[in-house]
From Swiss-Prot:
Name of the protein in question: Phosphoserine aminotransferase
NCBIfam families on file: PRK05355.1, serC_1
Modified residues annotated as N6-(pyridoxal phosphate)lysine in this record: K194
Residues noted as binding L-glutamate in the record, renumbered to the chain: R42
Cofactor note: Binds 1 pyridoxal phosphate per subunit.
Residues reported to bind pyridoxal 5'-phosphate: A76, S77, W101, T151, D170, Q193, N234, T235
Function of the molecule: Catalyzes the reversible conversion of 3-phosphohydroxypyruvate to phosphoserine and of 3-hydroxy-2-oxo-4-phosphonooxybutanoate to phosphohydroxythreonine.
EC numbers for this chain: 2.6.1.52
GO cellular component, as recorded: cytoplasm
Pathway: Amino-acid biosynthesis; L-serine biosynthesis; L-serine from 3-phospho-D-glycerate: step 2/3
Compartment(s): Cytoplasm
An example Gene Ontology biological process: L-serine biosynthetic process
Amino acid sequence: MERVYNFSAGPAVLPVPVLEKVQRELLSYNGSGMSVMELSHRSELFQNILDDAESLIRELMEIPENYKVLFLQGGASLQFDMVPMNLANGKKAAYVNTGSWAKKAISEAKKIQGVEVEVIASSEDRNFSYIPEIPTVSSDAAYLHVTTNNTIEGTAMFDVPDSAVPVVADMSSNILSSVYDVKKFGLIYAGAQKNIGPAGLTLVIVREDLIGQVEGLPSMLDFKVQAENDSMYNTPPTFAIYVAKLVFEWIKEQGGVAGIEALNRKKAALLYNYIDQSDFFSSPVEPSARSLTNVPFVTNSAEFDKAFVQEAEANGFKNLKGHRSVGGMRASLYNAFPIEGVEALIAFMEKFANARKGGEVRV
């Protein structure tokens, strides 16, 4: 079956070689006569998968030994609660508000009893079209929470501020797509369904000294319990971890995160350059803050936007509709998205624009 160009913001496109390997191994993994989905999580076969996945992500992100790597469940949304529960410890928590997901993290932290949330910077005044300057964080704060890529609004934070307190980062939509120095962070978390693998897995990278600060937490929500049990306090998402391991292998073959970032910059530059020179399409994001992985764009008409999404869908360009909260279009160019798809999209955009410059709307 012919593949389409899938611009979904998540779950998102996976590398074809990974999907092909999953297909080959689906009925019998490693000659076992069992699918990965059927393996006991306590078996040697799965333990090897888990160990390999951790080893690979440590290599790809250059994770120091004094950080734990956890393969959890509940999505990044559960980390909105786990982070303040485990790290706040009666102190103030500083947050930067750069978009919809940051707002949700802030909202959830405020629900945790005993946690005082301070929003120290925000770009909401201009519809989250830029990354705000982050002031010095008080040393009596428990942590500083940032969102490195704002999936809905299409902005990214590439320069992480130096901070006297641990920096916590939601990297869900640009982990492994840009190089970050893990040592600058106290904790990194990311839902898997954009650059890592299938939905259902959450990656957490946490510095050891931040674990076990709060006693009496529910076991499933306690980083200490999860770390002491090597991500297997309960049955982990075994199939998602297996696919993640294959994706990590694929990234390594592409030249690691640095190689992936170079390709991502080429893909994003192609699309942004076309949008910027177009007199039909435009970007709502300030150039200095533009994401490499999520590219929103609009026409000057909601009717044209609707027509574009419908015709794009009919021509094999799937999931280009912008998030319901912002409208317009959004092209998500995650690691596995091919540069040929960007080139094909640009050609389609040019054709669409030329046909509409006289004011015609075709649906």
